[in-house]
Structure formats: C-alpha cells, structure tokens
Amino acid sequence: MKNKIDVSLIQSFFLGVWRFVLHLVSRLKEDQINVRAGHLTYVTLLSLVPMVAVTMSVLSAFPVFQGIRGTIETFVYENMIPAAGDTVQTYINEFVKNASKGTAVGIGFLVVVAIMLISAIDKSLNAIWRTKEKRRFMVAFSMYWMVLTLGPVLMGASIAVTSYLVSLKVLSEADVYGVVPMLIEKLPLMFSVAAFLLLYMAVPNQKVKFLHALLGALVAALLFEAGKRGFALYVTTFPSYEAIYGTLATIPILFVWVYLSWTIVLFGGVIAAALPEYLDYDDGGDEDAQGCQDAPSGEALSSPKENPSSSSSTKPKTDNDPG
C-alpha cells in the first residue's frame, strides 16, 4: 500500500512539472522574450559605456574603493564577458577615459543614457509580470537613481569584503578541507543568484513571493554560469568570428553574449512570474475536483429539475384512468 502511494505521489509530481513546463512554453511565446532580449541588447550596447562611466565615477567618490578598483573591474569582466573580457575591458576603459573628459552637458547625457537602460529593464520585467499599474514618475526616477548610485557601492563593498575575508590568515590556516577555495570558486554563482533575486523581487511593481523569485534566480544563475562556459568553449574552439572579422571579432562576440544574457535573465523572470499563475490554477482545479468527489451523486451531476406538470403528464396509466 505504501509503495502504491509513493508511486502515485511521484507520478503526480512529474505530471505537475510537465504541466508547468507546458504552461511555461506558452508563457514564453506570449511574452516574446526573444524580441525583448533583442531590444535590451540594443539599449545595453548603447548605454554600456555611459553605465560603466557612471559606475566608476561613483566608486571613485569613495576612497576605500581606490585600491581595489582593478580587482572589481577584473572580477566583473571575467565573469560577465567570457573569452573576450580582457579586450572588452581595454576598449571600454579607453572609452570611459574619453567620456570623462567631456563637458557637464556630455556627462548629463551619459547619465540619461544609463537611466534608459534601467528603464528598459523595468518595462520588460513589468510586462512579463503583467503589471497594470505603472510607477509614478518621481518614484520611478528615484528608484533608477538609487540603482545608479547604490548599485556600484553595494557591488564594490561585496567584492571588497570577499577579498578581505579570503586574505585573512585565520581562514587559510583553519581551512583543512579546502572549503575556502571551493567557496571562492562558487562566488560568481552566488553573486548571480543574489543579483537575479534582487532584480525579480524589486523591479516588478507588485508583490513577488520570495520562493518564486528564488527559484527563477537559481535557474537563471545556473543557466548564466553554464552559458558562460559553453560560450567561452565555442569561441575558443571554433574561432570563426576571428577569421571573418579579424581585429573586430570582439564586437559580434559581445553582441551575441549580451543577447544570450538577456534571454537568460528574462527566462528566469518568466519562471518566477508564471509559477504563481500555475499554482493558483492547479489549486483551483484540485479544489473543484475534490468538491465533485465529496458531493452526493445527485448534487455532483447537473440535471434539469423536474416540474410537477411534466411529471404528472408522464405518469404511467392505470386501469382506473379514463380512456
């Protein structure tokens, strides 16, 4: 009896997973994440240099980050742009240096373009969550400005704290089983999970359950890490871009990787947004089915009520009836 129950539970679990996958595929088609990822790729490439310039300007305002600026840049480029991080870092640093020499109007334009990227992310994720109410202009602007100012500080602080903890002699001496190297290796994955979780919890203009956002963040982070390894392997194993584009091979590589990255980000968002829809529908269906099982047979089946006239007219005739 116990084995039968266990088998039925396993079957129902996998059936539920399969139904959710079908619902997810339908949701992906409706949301057109490939089109949204293309739009975000265009905006990202347009605002990449302004965003980096604003980020570095914010970090430069804090003396504590001066000594680890190179460490932060290396960590970001190595973990965000596989196989071409050094080249992209060289070009972007040169562009940022040129942009920092501009006038106040030019710097203001950089800030506006950087805000365009945050606004595009906000609109795409709220469209995936089917958010009907838009944020007020001042609320949205305050949120975008907070991301521009506090985002780099939090990122720099987290990397600085991690570097400090890793360099502690106490940890290195107490690390008998090699836990510290393992944690260092998993740091990019943990940062990705935290970043996606914050994105899925904060950006949609509605309440998102923590577990739903965490599941989407975990899937997106795992896909992001797998995508980095796979993309780096493809670029290094099949260097067709370098044979075609030569020294400009970094440009299409960056285009493709940014597009894949946004596809993964939006895919995780669709998972987090579709999960409560599916669970609500599934619970409703289960309740209806349970209600039909608990109800008496006469109430469970819908049949038209008999009226007295029709019942009397259909009575069988007896011998005493006339005619």
Curated annotation (Swiss-Prot):
Membrane topology field: Multi-pass membrane protein
Chain segments annotated as coiled-coil in the UniProt record: none
Low complexity: compositionally biased ranges: 302-315
Keywords: Cell inner membrane, Cell membrane, Membrane, Transmembrane, Transmembrane helix
Membrane-spanning parts: 5-25, 45-65, 102-122, 137-157, 179-199, 207-227, 251-271
Region (Disordered): 285-323
InterPro entries tied to this protein: UPF0761_bac, Virul_fac_BrkB
Pfam families registered for this protein in UniProt: Virul_fac_BrkB
GO annotation, cellular component aspect: plasma membrane
NCBIfam families registered for this protein in UniProt: PRK01637.1, yihY_not_rbn
Family to which this protein belongs: Belongs to the UPF0761 family.
Name assigned to this protein: UPF0761 membrane protein Sama_3404
Lineage: Bacteria, Pseudomonadati, Pseudomonadota, Gammaproteobacteria, Alteromonadales
